[in-house]
Amino acid sequence: MKQLLDFLPLVIFFAVYKFFDIYIASGALIAATALQLIVTYALYKKLEKMHLITFAMVTVFGTLTLVFHDDAFIKWKVTIIYALFALALGISQLLNKSILKSMLGKEMQVADKIWAHITWYWVIFFATCGLVNIYVAFSLPLETWVNFKVFGLTALTLVNTVITVFYLYKHLPEDQRKELK
């Protein structure tokens, strides 16, 4: 259910864009992200930092898009969010306080070296996605960017999540692997 809620704003953004335009879709994205926070809090009595950061970025860049009637702001939002995720993961790893380990370490006990590999993998992934977003957003038609944002980045994230799970599974202690079978 939680994962479905995470996709709600994206689905609404895409649908509204297809029927209207980027400006109405940006307003819908702000509203849908606020609704996502409200529903998530109502169901789980907790909000994750990632959701709050995303909401703040959506609100700021969505509002700038509407006020200045310039879609460049909503396009930059994607790159800035990915850059923030890459920086947060990279800095936490440099400080030996892996965010990924703190999120998943209780369920999956693997060596710190493995957490470091995964963290740097995601740093590179987020940085690359941010750079590719800049290219697609400002070199290709708006419709191509919307499709890339909704389908391309979502698919890439899902594929990288699967790769991460398999990599973690490969390095789990034998007793933990048996529990997962």
From Swiss-Prot:
Transmembrane segments: 10-30, 50-70, 72-92, 118-138, 148-168
Pfam families cross-referenced by the UniProt entry: IspA
Disulfide bridges in this chain: none
GO-annotated cellular components: plasma membrane
Membrane topology annotation: Multi-pass membrane protein
InterPro entries listed in its UniProt record: YciB
Keywords in alphabetical order: Cell inner membrane, Cell membrane, Membrane, Transmembrane, Transmembrane helix
Cellular compartment(s): Cell inner membrane
Protein family according to the UniProt entry: Belongs to the YciB family.
HAMAP family, per the entry: YciB (MF_00189)
Role description: Plays a role in cell envelope biogenesis, maintenance of cell envelope integrity and membrane homeostasis.
PANTHER family, alphabetized: INNER MEMBRANE-SPANNING PROTEIN YCIB, INTRACELLULAR SEPTATION PROTEIN A-RELATED
This protein's name: Inner membrane-spanning protein YciB
Species of provenance: Shewanella sp. (strain W3-18-1)
Gene name, Swiss-Prot/TrEMBL: yciB
